Amino acid sequence: AFRFGLTNERGYGNTYRVLKNITGLWLLQGLKVHLPENTSFADMEEMTREGGKLMHVIDPDDPLFYNPEDMKEAFDSYFRKTGQKLPGVFSEYLLCAYESLCFSFRYHIEKLEQFTGRNIEVLHLVGGGSQSDYLCRRIASVCGRKVVAGPVEGATLGNILIQGLAMGRIRNIAEGRGLIRQACPLRTYQPVDAPDMTRYRAFLEMKKT
């Protein structure tokens, strides 16, 4: 567990779950500041679709991306460090960010499978990222697994559930989860496109350095 960088998180009823902290949409938030102020994440996804063929890849867990003053410059520094040409248009940065995040998710899922000896067949995506239809589809295809997206406010709903249990308004966790499913319809995504295995192998080589 130490070698894989895993930890444990305590939950309700003396339960524990294996936890791995990795970089997420922070990359896209950092790139967003280089776009007009009224640009939405939906606009960024549309730009990503215009990015053409994937030509760049990064390791989102590299220290360069932890808290840079300029995320685009952090990308450029990483490209220079790894011998990649700089993107010619901004949409290539976005495409690189989205696809590299999906590669990172796949990598860490495979590591979790090695560590636990269990196959992970379904990915549950909660929080703000679950609102992105594009991201959910890409995660499903790159990771080769079904993705269940939602709810968006997972932490808040979990807090409400536990308070309901403490107040006797909810009988047990199963009932609370059922109420959440009724209140927050989930979306399901299946793998559609094959991942770019050439770029994924390049990503794996980066993880070795």
Q: What name fits each language-model region?
A:
Residues 1-122, 131-155, 161-197, 201-208:
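Active-site core segments that coordinate phosphate-bearing ligands/cofactors
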